[in-house]
């Protein structure tokens, strides 16, 4: 029934497209010298990250993605999801004598999507001159082409003569991820007008495949051709100069054609005024050569747009028909399927399972696209890379909607492509799993989550995966946990509730996997370590001397003592604050991951304190800061678009974060979802629904959930042409801020919250941890004392004797991990004697060795652990 209804909707959409009107002839462009003047043009920048809509075909052979931002075509990725080629493709309209209007400068817009969310229709309105441009965006399932179908209409009550208007398409490019221009002119593009098929087709290309991302070995020469069903004249030139078509049209309302513009920041302008009627289709075709890109574009245009659109939409309808539909949530179908499709659309098509953190790069409009780094053009991957933690969150959405195949592909990507020889996962990677220029230090939750993913997706039974990947990851956690590297916000070291919650879940999953492979020693080691972390989580992260209550979770403790009067800088231009005053909702992961009950007194107290101190009410609903001490004093987080007054040091309201690495952090919609899951765990369904609605309201465009939402008074956009380093993009209280939208993590959170409301419980809470820590209460503990070797001792042989005491008859597991050489950890097992003593010869490496000893009593449900390094 649902499938039939969705198909009828698509046919209705096709019928609407088929009935669109058609447009009028334009004047012939003047001719001039073939080579454009003004090289290399103004500095190029990347793209606005607050997207209105995104899309790609479900067909894996069509390796092109489109995005729309500020009402016009924005980032277009091809042939991989991290390779951006377009700054903007937008229309310029002129009457040829009195005005020239540009979409982003002179028009307002609204945006809508089809039921899948993958086809986007933008209505741009020029109220002053009485016309509208209605444009639908898709990609061709059969090729690497973005298609735009546009109808020119008058506004209601207008007497505008549409036949007197001339329509131009202006393409501002940064092909192959760089755009040149300015002083450095790095990654310069070249533009030509191709006439091989008769009509003029502008082509912009870059054959450079070398950037400062030395591991990005999959880059290829990229050519981009702009063709149209009505193409009468075309020109290429340098942005911001006399050869820029916009400059010409603004000055004289006519286009002067140039056929060649080598090495610079290239713009192409094409007269696409329809020969008859008021309708035109544009094709942006890609290839590895000029001829191929032109051929690809023309082939896509040879098919009626309506038929291509139907094929495109039916691909997504078929995908959605295979998903699990939440019970009783029909009113949320659009949000649910949009979220599911955004997650699937965020997967690269060359590297299966490589699902990026976002189809946008934060504040791209302020990041230069024509500069060098280490002597090469600077690669700007940013969120279009793979982060293990984000991929886990995406995984939970995929599992919730029933796309187990993609969930497994994501898991295998992390283990097969990204995992380091030590067993750990890096902060992030390129699409091939190799280190990116911004790959930084380790984060233990990013090593823990993939183990949980393997267990929950049914991959734990794979022997090779266990031996070569899961076991080294779990060994690394035992040797380095509970505190190593930074927490989930990637800024602070210390003992973090959210990080340790992930470790507990990952090690519990590893224990079950080890047991299934007959490795009892490791099964005991992993579970005992997880139990030790669960037993001590409050000792490390709950303060009893803080200002906000008698006992509550803090963001993190720097040393494992949450009562210590230690202050630290929050970073990004934020203040320095006593650790006992810094709040964060990360402790809720202990509930979501089945390690503490929501009724736990410290959980309850902390929820109330977080609600009081780091939540903000907006017209869209309640949102939460990442962390802070007092929302009443303004944001203490410096990662975001600047606003004053706040606790941060930025000075220009609306300025983007990147140029100074400082700003003002805003509300994170994903944290409204996190708080909603705690409500749902308490049985507070109405509270959870209210927070879900806030997430929906915070969205940009057609329902894309952003990384951040603005919670301050409305702030207007800076005038067109303002300095990108300081310009405001315009903000509305309770709507998306400027960092990135959609955020894949947030889209997954929205999806799984809808699924959880349908199920009546949190669908991603692991059964394995719930059974161990909640259903029967946490297991008891055993005393473990290590008597030799002493911590810090120098060992001169390849083995050492580890001795100690514990409960008589306990099974003892001893892990030795050499953190210097990175050799595989070893696990030795023995049994405590009748007096509780144990002794075992353990192999050690030539570097610094971490020795971890655990003891387990069979059948008693009691475990204990000790640690010596």
Where are these regions (language model features)?
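Extended ligand-binding clefts on enzyme/binding-domain cores
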Residues: 179, 201-236, 326-327, 331-335, ...
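C-terminal capping/lid segments that line or modulate ligand- or cofactor-binding pockets
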Residues: 33-80, 394, 430, 437-454, ...
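Aromatic-rich carbohydrate-recognition surfaces in CAZymes
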Residues: 155, 182-184, 196, 206-207, ...
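Well-ordered alpha-helical scaffold segments within catalytic/enzyme domains
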Residues: 152-154, 321-328, 338-346, 392-405, ...
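An extended acidic
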Residues: 33-125, 204-244, 315-325, 329
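Long, well-ordered core segments of solenoidal/helical folds
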Residues: 343-351, 403-426, 459, 465-486, ...
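Acidic/polar, glycine-enriched structural segments that form the non-catalytic walls/loops
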Residues: 31-40, 129-132, 140-149, 153-382, ...
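Ser/Thr-rich low-complexity repeats and stalk/linker segments
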Residues: 779-869
